[in-house]
From Swiss-Prot:
GO cellular component: cytoplasm; small ribosomal subunit
Family in the record: Belongs to the bacterial ribosomal protein bS16 family.
Protein name: Small ribosomal subunit protein bS16
Keyword Ribonucleoprotein tagged: yes
Transmembrane segments: none
Gene3D superfamilies hit by this protein: 3.30.1320.10
Disulfide topology: none
A GO BP annotation: translation
Keyword Ribonucleoprotein attached: yes
GO terms, molecular function: structural constituent of ribosome
Taxonomic placement: Bacteria, Pseudomonadati, Pseudomonadota, Gammaproteobacteria, Oceanospirillales
Keywords from the named record: Ribonucleoprotein, Ribosomal protein
Pfam family, one: Ribosomal_S16
InterPro entries referenced in this protein's UniProt entry, alphabetically: Ribosomal_bS16, Ribosomal_bS16_CS, Ribosomal_bS16_dom_sf
Amino acid sequence: MVTIRLARGGAKKRPFYHLTVSDSRKSRDGRFIERIGFFNPVARGQEERLRVDLERAAHWQELGAQVSDRVAELLKEARKQQA
């Protein structure tokens, strides 16, 4: 099954996440099909906190990709920002 989920990056105590489309059998930070955005939970000031390609996310959802709980919240937030 294909899932849209977060892959962790960044340094220790400074998390940074990529929104990835990947096979659910692969590891969290492993091989992915497509990277559709990023999420920086520790962004400060003018740093960009969230960027998502909503068109690609919608495309993968139409093809049947499952969305993780946290990514669903982030997609909702991104749609709100865009409106």
